[in-house]
Amino acid sequence: VELMEKEGVVFKLDTEIGKNYPAVKLVNEFDAVVLCTGSTKPRMLTCEGADLKGVHYAVDFLKANTKSLLDSNLEDRMFISAEGKNVIVVGGGDTGTDCVGTSIRHGCKSVTQLEIMPELSEERMPNNPWPEWPRIKKTDYGQEEAIELYGKDPREYLTTVTKIEGDDMGNVKAVHTVEVDWSTGA
């Protein structure tokens, strides 16, 4: 970042364009504009049982892990531990991959990653030519670690959660899923 600043890149952090910095001013003052965003609010699960003990959102899981790692190399134990747990990650994107990898490094018993979309081809399809962004299957570090450790890809495609079942203490006991059928345009 320092090198980029020395080269003339200006960073405007924690800025709400249109509110505390006019969009027209931004466009007029700079040769190029790059908007970098990140979500601090999770996409909430809407199924029964989403409020049970043991259901954690990625932003909370990853943020606490990173803070504990940077502050104490995880020695303060101020993170949500996946150690010894059977982990279900809902979501197949980069954040889901981070959750898979972090859970493995915690020493989870198993990890399954649910992906609502179909498995993509390893090669470009005719309707996805260059220079479009390639819509191909991407096996990232989290999945690679799972394959190495457990002998199989953790991803379950065309799958979504319908219910999270709890025990008498309010802890997650089971996750109910259903296969998604996109052929009807659902």
Regions found by a protein language model. Give the residues of each.
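Short glycine- and Lys/Arg-enriched binding-loop motifs that mark or flank ligand-binding interfaces
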Residues: V34, L45, V87-V89, C99
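Flavin (primarily FAD) binding-site architecture
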Residues: C36-D51, V55-V59
